[in-house]
Amino acid sequence: MGPQAAAGRMILLVVLMLSAKVGSGALTSTEDPEPPSVPVPTNVLIKSYNLNPVVCWEYQNMSQTPIFTVQVKVYSGSWTDSCTNISDHCCNIYEQIMYPDVSAWARVKAKVGQKESDYARSKEFLMCLKGKVGPPGLEIRRKKEEQLSVLVFHPEVVVNGESQGTMFGDGSTCYTFDYTVYVEHNRSGEILHTKHTVEKEECNETLCELNISVSTLDSRYCISVDGISSFWQVRTEKSKDVCIPPFHDDRKDSIWILVVAPLTVFTVVILVFAYWYTKKNSFKRKSIMLPKSLLSVVKSATLETKPESKYSLVTPHQPAVLESETVICEEPLSTVTAPDSPEAAEQEELSKETKALEAGGSTSAMTPDSPPTPTQRRSFSLLSSNQSGPCSLTAYHSRNGSDSGLVGSGSSISDLESLPNNNSETKMAEHDPPPVRKAPMASGYDKPHMLVDVLVDVGGKESLMGYRLTGEAQELS
């Protein structure tokens, strides 16, 4: 073979090498390209708030989600894993830092796909020196009239929502704070600021108590507090203002209650009584009033002490008409008399006397013990089936002792005149005149009534005076 053959072989070898490179480039272009290196996390910092340490970092945006691994190292110790394969940018390292007064470091690396970045390391962190502490708790109470009690609560160590204790007098908490109380007093538009220091003798493991004397509690007070660690020179955050309103004397309020409450009860009782009295009187005004004529009858019946005797009705079959007596049959509307006879004059006089007795309402002449008047009257009602209205039989004497004439009307007079005379009954009636009594004989309080005499012939031969309906009332009924 000559030199030409050797040169041809060399050219062929070069072509094969170039084609192999081109094929490998095309194959890798179809797959996802991996970055030549994974970026390192930046700004790795350890922070602590109320002794709760946390390490945080920053990382650039990637097409794939990166995951991180965190390691912690304390002074004179080794690196230990705290958080592995997390996607968050913060990790709590409370469990790895057992002593807050010892220096600690943290480092973080990222992993994207199958490649990992280098570790990014934080600066030295001393929790008791560089950590932050929140404000203490505060509460105000009125202890006396011119004294306020301020309660300051130590900051708490809270990890994952659970309290791990308070920051007071323990090496694991590294802080014992000296508290300063700030008082803002608004007095008549002028704002006064004062400071009060809380002594350690006034504190325990939970709180500190401070008593503040004030001149008066009739103005507004606002109080806040903060603390400082004299060894580490760490100051807490200042608390929010807690204000107490002006003081009001409760004794004055109690006196007002004691005065107003009885007055209110008394007023309510008066109103209820007035309402009840008004309702009672309104019912009385609606009650039915009796006529004067019925009131006289009720009064006479009430004042009567003698027991009532039975009524004996004289019928036309057993008449007791005397020679000197006249039967007056009253029609429903009027009584018919002869105008020219002397008996009419006496009858008119008798009716006047009867009206006078009725108008006066006197019952003295009707009692059994009163002496007989010059004019004696005895009456009875004649009830008959063939008569349309009641009749009254009236006997009267003239003033000179002789019997007067007779006045009659209708057929009832002729029936009575045909009856035989009974002289013995006449004499008995003249010597023993029966007393007159009123008795209610009416029906219906809303109808007019007329005076009616009824003879009572039981025992003492008494006469009873009653009432009957007038013709006008009978027509209405």
Swiss-Prot record:
Record's compositionally biased regions (Low complexity): 402-416
Polar residues bias (residue ranges): 375-386
Extracellular-side segments: 26-254
Modification Phosphoserine occurs at: 362, 370, 379, 402
Subcellular location: Cell membrane
GO molecular function, one term: type II interferon receptor activity
TM stretches of this protein: 255-275
Assigned keywords, A-Z: Cell membrane, Disulfide bond, Glycoprotein, Immunoglobulin domain, Membrane, Phosphoprotein, Receptor, Signal, Transmembrane, Transmembrane helix, Ubl conjugation
Record note on disruption phenotype: Deletion mutants show shortened lifespan and enhanced intestinal tumorigenesis. These tumors exhibit increased inflammation. Loss of STAT1 signaling pathway activation is also observed. After viral infection such as junin virus, mice develop disseminated infection and severe disease.
Biological process (GO), any one: negative regulation of amyloid-beta clearance
Cytoplasmic domain ranges by topology: 276-477
Transcription as UniProt keyword: no
Membrane-protein topology: Single-pass type I membrane protein
Effect of residue 445 to F: Complete loss of STAT1 and STAT3 activation
Glycosylated residues (UniProt): 61, 85
Annotated region (Disordered), positions in chain: 335-386, 402-446
Pfam family, one: IFNGR1_transm
Any one Gene Ontology cellular component term annotated for this protein: plasma membrane
Keyword Glycoprotein attributed: yes
Gene3D superfamilies noted in UniProt: Immunoglobulins (2.60.40.10)
SUPFAM superfamilies: Fibronectin type III (SSF49265)
UniProt xrefs under InterPro entries: FN3_dom, FN3_sf, IFN_gamma_rc_D2_pox/mammal, Ig-like_fold, Interferon_gamma_rcpt_asu, Type-II_Cytokine-TF_Rcpt
In-chain residues carrying the UniProt-annotated modification Phosphotyrosine: 445
Quaternary structure, from the entry: Monomer. Heterodimer with IFNGR2, to form the IFNG receptor complex. Interacts with JAK1. Interacts (when phosphorylated) with STAT1. Interacts with SOCS1.
Assigned protein family: Belongs to the type II cytokine receptor family.
Identification of the protein by name: Interferon gamma receptor 1
Lineage: Eukaryota, Metazoa, Chordata, Craniata, Vertebrata
Gene designation per UniProt: Ifngr1
